[in-house]
From Swiss-Prot:
Disulfide-bonded cysteines: none
Major site of localization recorded for this protein: membrane
Membrane topology, from the record: Multi-pass membrane protein
Gene Ontology CC terms: plasma membrane
Annotated keywords: Cell membrane, Membrane, Transmembrane, Transmembrane helix
Transmembrane residue ranges: 4-24, 30-50
Subcellular location: Cell membrane
Domain of life: Bacteria
InterPro entries: DUF1328
UniProt source species: Nitrobacter winogradskyi (strain ATCC 25391 / DSM 10237 / CIP 104748 / NCIMB 11846 / Nb-255)
Entry similarity comment: Belongs to the UPF0391 family.
Classification lineage: Bacteria, Pseudomonadati, Pseudomonadota, Alphaproteobacteria, Hyphomicrobiales
Name of the protein this chain belongs to: UPF0391 membrane protein Nwi_2359
């Protein structure tokens, strides 16, 4: 349990340094792009899975 506390403390400290250091603006734009790419891939995967599921029945 203590290992998890130390791990999350380190992650929180790194996130705080990056957030207050000005890197957050650039990271936010990259995160938006990655989010939309993941969303598109999810929709494609769901549609293909739905269509393949229908053919097997």
């Amino acid at each position: 349990m203590l290992n998890w506390v130390v791990t999350f403390l380190v992650i929180a400290l790194i996130a705080g340094v990056l957030g207050f250091g000005g890197i957050a603006g650039a990271s936010f734009e990259i995160a938006k792009i990655i989010f939309f790419i993941a969303l598109i891939l999810f929709v494609i995967s769901a549609v293909v899975g739905f269509l393949r599921g229908r053919n097997r029945v």
